[in-house]
């Protein structure tokens, strides 16, 4: 194809054709005309023309073709210019109305904002009125809850000790005795980690069994007989055997007495079913059936 386009002009019946092959093949594409974009000139209206147009616009916003032609003859302008002017004038009028409505809403909105706190205050007052009865009813509830709290005050401990004397009064009497003896013992042997060294386990397991057979048994005989007999031993009678970290275990369903020291701890848990004694080096277990 390119060779056909590049070849020199050829003759047809002895007449030389000087036109190119592209023109012969596509005569309409040979010299395309560049279309010029029509530029609409801006129309400037005089004061007299504007007065005539405004007068007609005051009468009607949508004039018909006859009215537009009549006005166009008066102001010496084409009818199309008059039509465009009315179109723009209607758009301008709508824009002004929207601005006025928005401005009116902006002026009314602050009034609504001013009235809204009053509504909120009224709603809050109504809400507070609704919530005041629960608050008044909750005061007796708080007073009733303060009553159990007052049980732990020193003034009310003494009257409550009588109904609890059957089971817990013996425990209360055993607190100071066991703690004072243990504190004195720990002062003498704070550095060592062994407690109750050199004691015979069978010497206190049998009386403990008789003392702990009943659920309401007291701790004062045990603490006065068994614990004091072994705590009052001389330091020379403490061999290398240690019963420190594991301590004495007496499981009880009622209460638990815990005494913790920096070096070691011993725990008394009272149970009438099982008596366990554990050592650090060897695990011993004594169960009284």
Swiss-Prot record:
Renumbered to this chain, the Low complexity biased-composition regions fall at 95-106, 118-129
- Which Gene Ontology cellular-component terms appear in the entry? nucleus
Q: Which residues bind DNA?
A: 38-97
What are the TM regions of this chain, as residue ranges?
none
Tell whether Nucleus is among the UniProt keywords: yes
Sorted alphabetically, the keyword list is: Developmental protein, DNA-binding, Homeobox, Nucleus
Q: Where is this region: Disordered?
A: 93-142
Q: Can the keyword Nucleus be found in this entry's annotation?
A: yes
Q: Where in the cell is it found?
A: Nucleus
A single Gene Ontology biological process assigned to it is: midbrain-hindbrain boundary development
The Gene Ontology terms for molecular function here are: DNA-binding transcription factor activity, RNA polymerase II-specific; RNA polymerase II cis-regulatory region sequence-specific DNA binding
- PANTHER family under this entry? HOMEOBOX PROTEIN, HOMEOBOX PROTEIN OTX2
Report the protein name in the record: Homeobox protein OTX2
